[in-house]
Amino acid sequence: MVQVNGNYLKLKAGYLFPEIGRRVKAFSAANPDAALIRLGIGDVTEPLPLACREAMKTAIDAMGTAEGFHGYGPEQGYGWLREAIAKHDFQARGCDISAEEIFVSDGSKCDSSNILDILGEGNRIAVTDPVYPVYVDTNVMAGRTGEAGEEGRYGGLTYLPISADNGFAAQIPSEPVDLIYLCFPNNPTGAVATKGQLKAWVDYARSNGSLILFDAAYEAFIQDPSLPHSIFEIEGARECAIEFRSFSKNAGFTGTRCAFTVVPKGLKGTASNGEAVELWGLWNRRQSTKFNGVSYIIQRGAEAVYSDAGQAEVKGLVNFYMENAAIIRRELSGAGLTIYGGEHAPYVWIKTPEGMDSWGFFDHLLNKANVVGTPGSGFGASGEGYFRLSAFNSRANVDAAMARIKAL
């Protein structure tokens, strides 16, 4: 009989969001008339920007002509989109990033997982705790961890706790690690990093030969102009970092699928024989072999994000969701709950009421208020006692959810 990948058997009971889905499904089956409000998974709700829709319509019409038809595109992405990304997202902020260093993809979740294809199995890995579960689970699937302990932490990983006690800022590891996952603005806590904090990570990585995997999927939600949007705003980051970005949350592409990864030329790792190897070439080879590129139509939609109209519409979407976050912060603070995040990210991180753990608070809100959120413990042991609410929903639903919770 064929053998399975035994690493999958090390995974805990279920990926966080499917487990939430299972509980919600069971509740809905038992309470078919309940009007649930979902503030859990970070999926957007507002329509795609008009500029993007019009660009995709034009691209569809072009595909119906002999002159405008496009088959397989470049695996790295069309040059015009890569140029727009480099100009607007990086060069405009003083980052030395060229179009050739940008790889367009169908999602930053995919890229942050697939990047392991080009990295060795013996790397020592550091993640924050709490953490976006994909970083941990993909390393488990790839056989880069041991078994999970009683708290759910996997052997072989270095966990860096973040909580209110340390201002949600992970401490630099006391021992050398090879691979460091950082996410700012942070999912799930909503915390942000200053340039000084990122510089400390870059300095550590350069001193120890480490690689930072920097997830900037929520950078568009930063409100303070002094805060960095990219790791490449930090001097020396080209020598030690790869960055993941997405159009999902700022432009509403969760169902449309377009993202990109930045791999600087000159960024190197080490082969088993000690030889220095450029990661750009390995990632380019990986993408050329395993990926056929993002649809021409979708890339035209993403390009429109950088038009004047697209930029204005994206700003409007970001402002809308951040207004939702402000409502959640204000209403729940007024209800006596301790609130973090929600100022530079679309996530509000809540301290659960005394005597209630994360899943207990989840069940409490589901059963008593018919509101779905995300238990903090699902993001790691240090998330126990916290709870995440997402600002991605309609204003009417956010207002209704707050009224229900305050009435408890």
Swiss-Prot record:
It catalyses: (2S,6S)-2,6-diaminopimelate + 2-oxoglutarate = (S)-2,3,4,5-tetrahydrodipicolinate + L-glutamate + H2O + H(+). The modification N6-(pyridoxal phosphate)lysine is found at K249. Pathway: Amino-acid biosynthesis; L-lysine biosynthesis via DAP pathway; LL-2,6-diaminopimelate from (S)-tetrahydrodipicolinate (aminotransferase route): step 1/1. GO terms for molecular function: L,L-diaminopimelate aminotransferase activity; pyridoxal phosphate binding. SUPFAM superfamilies: PLP-dependent transferases (SSF53383). Its EC number is 2.6.1.83. It holds the Pfam family Aminotran_1_2. The keyword Transferase applies. Keywords: Aminotransferase, Pyridoxal phosphate, Transferase. InterPro entries: Aminotransferase_I/II_large, DapL/ALD1, PyrdxlP-dep_Trfase, PyrdxlP-dep_Trfase_major, PyrdxlP-dep_Trfase_small. GO terms for biological process: lysine biosynthetic process via diaminopimelate, diaminopimelate-aminotransferase pathway. Substrate binds at Y15, G42, K109, Y132, N187, N292, R388. It is an enzyme of class 2 (transferase). Its cofactor is pyridoxal 5'-phosphate. Pyridoxal 5'-phosphate binds at Y72, S108, K109, Y132, N187, Y218, S246, F247, S248, R257, N292. Involved in the synthesis of meso-diaminopimelate (m-DAP or DL-DAP), required for both lysine and peptidoglycan biosynthesis. Catalyzes the direct conversion of tetrahydrodipicolinate to LL-diaminopimelate. Homodimer. Belongs to the class-I pyridoxal-phosphate-dependent aminotransferase family. LL-diaminopimelate aminotransferase subfamily. This is LL-diaminopimelate aminotransferase. The gene is dapL.
